Amino acid sequence: MALSKIDVANFLTGTIPQGNVANASLGAVTALPAAIATGKVLQVSNFVQASSAQTFSSTSYADLTNVTVNITPSATSSKILILSNIGSDLNDGEGYGMQFVRGSSSIYATKTLYTLYSEGVTQVYNVNMFNYYDSPNSTSQQTYKVQIRSYNNASINISTSYNSNIQVMEIAG
């Protein structure tokens, strides 16, 4: 059996014939990012934050005042990335749930309630980050907002030491 030695460093030089490459030529690969229009950030909304603290004491969802933002997608294939931070002041055994609402419909709700159970600590200020990737399939203006509900009807404070906020981005889809 004959053995061949291949010079790997100089194995391929020159130009590959066009018929051997499915994409016209290797030079066309640089055009690939332009050919794939998904994933680009097309627009970013204003950063909107709560202007004052708010207390929630019901297990039913209620709006987080002023934490609402509008965006008008440029294409029906666009996705909307929702970014939100919720600042809370929880006492031991208290907690909350949150949901994102588009128009009047819930599009995402936490599966579990964020609760504080800590031995020896009576009060904690914290910030939780919530993100969601939405597909409104529309070029009409979309309104997104945050709603909060209490755990076990406890009276919880939101946006006391940290102003809760929301921001959205249109992503090419």
Language model features: what each stretch is:
Residues 1-53, 173:
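Glycine-rich, low-complexity segments
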Residues 47-48, 54-57, 61, 72-141, ...:
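Terminal beta-strand-rich extracellular "head" domains
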Residues 63-65:
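Short, solvent-exposed loop/turn segments enriched in Ser/Thr/Gly
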Residues 67-71:
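Extended, low-complexity regulatory regions
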